Amino acid sequence: MTQAATRPTNDAGQDGGNNSDILVVARQQVLQRGEGLNQDQVLAVLQLPDDRLEELLALAHEVRMRWCGPEVEVEGIISLKTGGCPEDCHFCSQSGLFASPVRSAWLDIPSLVEAAKQTAKSGATEFCIVAAVRGPDERLMAQVAAGIEAIRNEVEINIACSLGMLTAEQVDQLAARGVHRYNHNLETARSFFANVVTTHTWEERWQTLSMVRDAGMEVCCGGILGMGETLQQRAEFAAELAELGPDEVPLNFLNPRPGTPFADLEVMPVGDALKAVAAFRLALPRTMLRFAGGREITLGDLGAKRGILGGINAVIVGNYLTTLGRPAEADLELLDELQMPLKALNASL
């Protein structure tokens, strides 16, 4: 886990006066000093008028280039266990509590290895094994262990896992098997979490992340934007992530799934999504910020390009867990067009 972002000592939303322009403040504080914006300052960014969006994106890109460099990390993900989850995350079609078309299924080890091979061929350095569970039982841990061993024997790629909430023993087991990074999203601001999930708490997720950090694995933690949270809660979420100090923050945008409680929510407006991308970059200047699920329906091709030029420095290629993504070739062509080099495997170890 990266060191928690340096926070400004001035708690004023505009860092030194009500008449200060937030982008001028951000240029001095974030770009020049590498200090992330605080919660009030992030809110001021999110509240900027649309006619300042391009200026905001340009600044976020400068911050990304200065504090993270030009390289882009590419990752692929695969679902080892799909569907049948006992939790009630309102955005998720894999919950067994909703009338969703997704049914429970397991992936066999040869298919897992083949997926890892295809991911590596795309230029990705990270392959994440995901399971739709509250937390892994003995069967799942054994399957994950077998999968990790099989992949290591045939594919040169970093292995990440996303298996829900863990016990201390399970954390140690994954670390001992060389898991490079563990993903467990907080999903949204603490104050909004009960509107999204009722079968477990925000604090339970935080506890898993703390154990992962203490075990020496990299921490991947982000969430989903556009689930009905206010701008104030969006800013709160950015500040909470900055306090956590993860190595990677995946930004998802709600793609309303049939049969879920959020099925009828509207897709997040493009301008709001891009402002959020830039705002999270200004809150987390040194953190890997990854485009994840929902960007296709929310941003489209042009929006994705603007996001990569507005603070993003990592992408998931190919399909997601239950929804289609962009073809890997399309993302790689875009990165080549933008002259963004891919992060090499040896640089990510």
UniProtKB/Swiss-Prot annotation:
Record-listed [2Fe-2S] cluster binding positions: C128, C161, C220, R290
Modified residues (N-acetylthreonine): T2
Regulation of activity: Requires the biotin synthase auxiliary protein BsaP for activity. Inhibited by acidomycin. Competitively inhibited by 5'-deoxyadenosine (dAH), S-(5'-adenosyl)-L-cysteine (AdoCy) and S-(5'-adenosyl)-L-homocysteine (AdoHcy).
UniProtKB keywords: 2Fe-2S, 4Fe-4S, Acetylation, Biotin biosynthesis, Iron, Iron-sulfur, Metal-binding, S-adenosyl-L-methionine, Transferase
Phenotype seen when the gene is deleted: The deletion mutant is unable to grow without extrabacterial biotin. Cells lacking this gene are shown to be highly attenuated in a mouse tuberculosis model.
Cofactor(s) named in the record: [4Fe-4S] cluster; [2Fe-2S] cluster
Keyword Metal-binding part of the UniProt annotation: yes
Molecular-function annotations in GO: 2 iron, 2 sulfur cluster binding; 4 iron, 4 sulfur cluster binding; biotin synthase activity; iron ion binding
GO annotation (BP), single: biotin biosynthetic process
EC class name: transferase
Residue ranges occupied by any Radical SAM core domain in the UniProt entry: 70-295
Gene Ontology terms: cellular component: peptidoglycan-based cell wall; plasma membrane
Cofactor stoichiometry and binding remark: Binds 1 [4Fe-4S] cluster. The cluster is coordinated with 3 cysteines and an exchangeable S-adenosyl-L-methionine.
Xref: Gene3D superfamilies: Aldolase class I (3.20.20.70)
The reaction(s) this protein catalyses: (4R,5S)-dethiobiotin + (sulfur carrier)-SH + 2 reduced [2Fe-2S]-[ferredoxin] + 2 S-adenosyl-L-methionine = (sulfur carrier)-H + biotin + 2 5'-deoxyadenosine + 2 L-methionine + 2 oxidized [2Fe-2S]-[ferredoxin]
A matching Pfam family: Radical_SAM
Entry note: thermal dependence: Optimum temperature is 37 degrees Celsius. The enzyme is stable up to 40 degrees Celsius and deteriorated at higher temperatures.
InterPro entries: Aldolase_TIM, BATS_dom, Biotin_synth/BioAB, Biotin_synthase, Elp3/MiaA/NifB-like_rSAM, rSAM
Known partners and oligomeric status: Homodimer.
Role according to the record: Catalyzes the conversion of dethiobiotin (DTB) to biotin by the insertion of a sulfur atom into dethiobiotin via a radical-based mechanism.
Protein name (Swiss-Prot/TrEMBL): Biotin synthase
Organism: Mycobacterium tuberculosis (strain ATCC 25618 / H37Rv)
Organism placement in taxonomy: Bacteria, Bacillati, Actinomycetota, Actinomycetes, Mycobacteriales
